[in-house]
Design a protein with these regions (language model features):
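Bacterial N-terminal signal peptides that target proteins for export
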Residues: 1-11
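Serine endopeptidase catalytic core focused on the charge-relay Asp
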Residues: 26-41, 48-89, 93-94, 103-105, ...
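Boundary/junction segments of secreted and surface-exposed precursor proteins
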Residues: 25-49, 310, 317-327, 332
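Short beta->alpha transition motifs characteristic of CBS
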Residues: 111-115, 210-213, 242, 259-267
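Catalytic nucleophile loop of clan PA
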Residues: 101-102, 199, 240-262
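C-terminal cap/linker of serine protease catalytic domains
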Residues: 132-133, 139-142, 146-150, 185, ...
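Sec/Tat signal peptide C-region and signal peptidase I cleavage site
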Residues: 20-24
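Bacterial N-terminal signal peptides
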Residues: 10-19
Length: 335
């Protein structure tokens, strides 16, 4: 089995061309048809979900503009990775290193390997709206400072191996997650709903929203659950890459979050022509992509107003709980 804890690129030469980028450590890939869509091309319900997805940036990659604006520092995807001509999204910018989702009024959920410690927390910025909003348009890389948030503290984090397994060193195949308290309450974006009910099953449809390779936001559906039996995570055939780490994975039917994209197969391959291509597999091929199950951390995510408690059946039996993540006990596990 390939080493799962690795940088986005499989080619050593490509790694040398990434001095300013720090992608998520777990690679991902394309299965069957490439289902990644731009924000503007997605269905309206997917756009609504996308508005609550964030990209993670280093503070040093965000330039302050006056008055009250910011500019994201990016590089050209194709040039930086020496992509072959014709590769999808080749001329777009890259710069984000992880993805995440708003699950409370000041609470973001991501992968545990995206924010490893207090130093990583202090250096990270969470940005809403990094996407291509109009057909023929360019990625939004200049925005108001109100769309940029800092990490105030790590509320809860876990990155560990699957219990009772004989995984090779470095292949932490268990759950991988972090809940991040922001420096202030989010305005203009709504927290997303998570599944607190029945588990997914093999064959259920799922969709991922995030920032593959640090690109502007992409929506990728057309995927299904391959194996839900793993401890702390499930396996799927999602079209994802490094940079997608931390992306929310939604139940295509219910539109609720079912998990967090955390790792997968090789992202890129060297072509005989000497350039880099995206790694592709048959729809049922490859090792699949791993998704932390939302059930392992849902108890630490505040309920949305009007959300039912487990076992409640009547329309009148609704509990409304304030979405204040400050009530959560900070718990930082060792990476």
């Amino acid at each position: 089995m390939k080493n799962l804890i690795k940088t986005t690129l499989s080619a050593a030469a490509a790694l040398l061309m990434l001095p300013i980028l720090s992608f998520a450590e777990e690679a991902k890939s394309i299965y069957g048809e490439d289902n990644r869509l731009e924000y503007f091309a997605a269905a309206q319900d997917m756009k609504t979900l996308s508005d609550s997805v964030v990209s993670f940036w280093k503070a040093t990659s965000i330039e302050t503009l006056n008055p009250g604006g910011v500019k994201l520092k990016t590089v050209n995807f194709g040039d930086r990775l020496n992509l072959c001509p014709g590769e999808k999204f080749r001329e777009q910018p890259i710069g984000a290193f992880c993805s995440g989702s708003l699950v409370g009024e000041d609470l973001v959920m991501t992968a545990g390997h995206c924010i490893k410690d207090d130093a990583g927390c202090a250096a990270a910025r969470m940005v809403f709206g990094y996407a291509i909003k109009k057909e023929g348009g360019e990625a939004v890389t200049t925005m108001t400072a109100s769309e940029v948030y800092s990490c105030a503290k790590i509320v809860k984090r876990f990155l560990g191996g699957e219990p009772d397994s004989a995984n090779p060193t470095g292949q932490n195949l268990g759950a991988d997650y972090a809940l991040i308290k922001l420096d202030r309450k989010v305005t203009g974006h709504k927290p997303l709903a998570v599944n607190r009910g029945a588990n997914l099953r093999k064959g259920d449809g799922i969709t991922v929203i995030g920032h593959p390779v640090g690109l502007p936001l992409k929506v990728a559906g057309g995927a299904t659950v391959r194996d839900f039996s793993k401890v702390g995570y499930f396996v799927a055939d999602l079209d994802t890459f490094g940079g997608n780490s931390g992306s929310p994975v939604f139940n295509t039917r219910t539109k609720k979050i079912e998990g967090i994209l955390v790792r997968g197969d090789e992202d890129f391959a060297d072509s005989p022509a000497g350039c880099t291509t995206m790694a592709t597999y048959e729809q049922t091929g490859g090792r699949g992509e791993d998704v932390t199950k939302i059930s392992v951390l849902s108890a630490s995510i505040p309920r949305l107003p009007g959300e039912k408690m487990a076992g409640e059946d009547g329309e009148d039996a609704l509990e409304v709980r304030a979405m204040d993540s400050s009530a959560l006990q900070a718990e930082v596990s060792a990476p």
